[in-house]
Amino acid sequence: MLLCTTSAHKLETVYDHKFLKMSIKESCAKEEKSQKKQTISSPTFNEDKKKGEISAGSTSSEHGVQPVSTKKRKLKADDTDNVYYNANRKNSKRLNVEVFIPKKRLKFSSSTQAVSYLNNNQMTSHSCSSNGTKDTKVKDCKLTNIGSKLNYEIKNHSRIKITKDMKSKPVDQTKEKNWPSLLIQKKMKELKKEKNNKDSSEELEKCKKNHLPQNYNFSNMIKESFESGRKKISFKIPKKSSTTLQKLVEEKIFTIDSSKSKSKQEEKQHLQSHQMSLNLARHKTENSFSDSTHKQSVCERIRKDHCEHQGTSSSDSKENHAQSFETPCSSVSSEDTQDADEEMQIVEELHAARVGRSVDLPVVPPSGELMSMEIDLVDEDAHPSAAHTASDTKLLIVMDTNVLMNHLKFVKILKTTEIPGFDTLVLIIPWVVIQELDRMKAGKLLKHVQHKAVPAIHFINNSLKSQDRKLWGQSLQLASQKLYGLSDENNDDRVLKCCLQYQQLFPCSLVILCTDDRNLRTKGLISGVKSLSKEDLDTEILNLTLNTDLCHQPCISKQQLNAEVPPAKETPKEGAANSGLSILLERIICDLEKCLGTALSSILETEMKIAFGNLWMEVLYLKPPWTLINLLQCFKKHWLAVFGLVMENNLLVTVESLYENLCKANKAVDFTTVKFLLQDSKSLLHAFSTRSNYDGVLPQTFAQVNKLLQVLAEVKTKLKPSSSESTRSKEQEDTSLVKLHNQDVNVFLDSNLPQATRHQEIWSVLESVWMSIYQNSTDVFQTLDSSSTLTTSKIASFEEAFVYLQKLMVAVKDILEGIQRILAPNSNYQDVETLYNFLIKYEVNKNVKFTARELYDCVSQTEYRERLTIGCRQLIEMECTMQQCSASVYMEARSRGWCEDMLNNRP
């Protein structure tokens, strides 16, 4: 199609050149004839002639209006034709112009059609040629329309010039005779000229607006038309895509403004009025071309409107998008958090609705699913087949909600406990317990226990996620099954049903229900399920580690257990001892948290009310309810403002030590940590007892801590029997240990107690050294600090404080040197001499006398070595503080002329 159109364009240009040459020859011949008739020739006339030829050539080449220009020059040269111009000559010339143009154009159009037809037969198919000729006809239509308009303007312009020439000619007689008729004709001509000028100007403006841009150059019209034609051809859309285009702009076609439709109609009428003056054949071709151009213009307008619509919509969307991001980041973050809260609220409400419906559990699943539910509990190793289950002995402990929330630490220790006489100890979490924890976490059951429900949920989730074989969960299928026709009236019945189901699933295992609910324990005992509280279970675990009494299970006996499970192979002695020690240590910590928490809460409330009055709750760092860790955090936070004013500042070290050891005990319980906790608690209570008894709370707590210390000493000796003792003697001693603990016997049976007491006395000397250094350094700092308003310092003068600071720095340096030598990896007996010489030199405690060997034995113990490490770190911090204080007052001391050798003692 491109080849057809290009060849057609080339042929059109060739015929245009031939047509122009012929018209120029004819005009030259007519001019030669007129020159022969003329008698006078002037150089001015020759110049006008040349200008006329140039203008005629340009106009004829562009628009084909050569005859008008030649006739015009003939009127200027011939004076005899002026009288008859208006009557005959004018009409004949108009006819000549109108007839001349269509003849030439008809020949041109027929030639182009013939050439295009030949080219189509030789080069391409008929369809391709038809498309090419159609495009060329559209272009010719546009060019002829513009040419007709320009011809109309040239005619009007020629009329004006002719009338002016007629007025300028000196013919007096004709003017006088024909004056009235000429005057009337003149007026009519002027009116017609004005009307034609207005019409032509309006038509030209409309054409320019519709077809041509502003400041358009007519000389480049042909080039631009061909270039635009090439662009249209190269981007021509196939017929299939035209349907999609119509679908895209179908709604836009019917939304065009009425003003646009009117302008289209006016343009169409104007084009048709100009085309009616042409020949019939030309008229038909032009009408067809105008229809095609009109359709193309409409399509172009539709595309433009569609593009504008897309542009405006995209711009609007961009503006809206930009406006949405004009808000500050804080509002965006707040909106994001609000959206997240709303989403979480929806999820929680939906979950709460499901939880509410899940109380009424579904009907029993079909037969055959019960055996598959064994797979849901744990994997094959943890849940063997039914045949292999009969030979397994497990201790299955069903945990109630209150135990998980109030004694989670005990549950964690219990999960890691090895019980002799059983293959494994497994914790069972009923389905209803998980539901209750979930609702408590959301605050729907008990709002004040949310902080306890969340850790329990995390513990269960982490254990199941890590596939811990010692924690199972009751599946939904098992919970939905009815047992003995029992209807689940409340959650207690569902927990009890879980115990009965696991008794059936594992008949050779012991199932224990652990709950603090007395009524639920009663139901369990009536139903044949062994039910214990947390305290009772703690004692029972110790009994099971020693006796392995399974009399509550009718299907198993002690002889079968001893025959099936050899204790030497399945339950080692060390494992049983460690399990018993962990349980006892955990019990001691729980008792300490209860009694010490009661005492510290009373102290905190009393001292805060004295300091702040009724506003003490607003000032308080952590609001109740408190744990022991929370109370210690409050003491640390308010020490300077409240407790440091009424107590010694060195007591803060004891509070910090309590806090660190308690955090350590929550992660892993060991004997040394528990012992440090009890000793620090005793020191703290003794210090506060000098101020007040706090309504009798401190004496009771002090007595309970002493009992726990005694029990700890018993545990240390009784759980480490000698290798020569038999297993039976060990079991008897462990049984007596449990009885002693249960009866709170305040008697020490440890034969090594005097040595332990000796070590405590030696350590008390080291503690007194630390307390003396701490108190003296505090007095020095207060005296040297000019901004301090406290007057509790015993040092009166600035000079005395400075001298005392130098002595303290030397003492701390010596103590650190001795402690660091003891804490060295390859330390021996000789390394303790430095510290021992310092203690003897300063005679810190004259009442306590000990040797270097006894000091070495004391610091060689693990617990005292750990304490010594903590003390070394605290002494290093104090040494740095002393150096900073000495450097800050050095210039002032030097200006006062104090002894230089004293200043040289600074490290």
UniProtKB/Swiss-Prot annotation:
Pfam families: PIN_4. Residues 395-522 form the PINc domain. Gene3D superfamilies: 5'-nuclease (3.40.50.1010). InterPro entries: PIN-like_dom_sf, PIN_dom, SWT1_Regulator. Belongs to the SWT1 family. Coiled coil: none annotated. This is Transcriptional protein SWT1. PANTHER family: TRANSCRIPTIONAL PROTEIN SWT1 (PTHR16161:SF0). Residues 56-69, 322-335 have a biased composition (Polar residues). Residues 30-75, 308-340 are annotated as: Disordered.
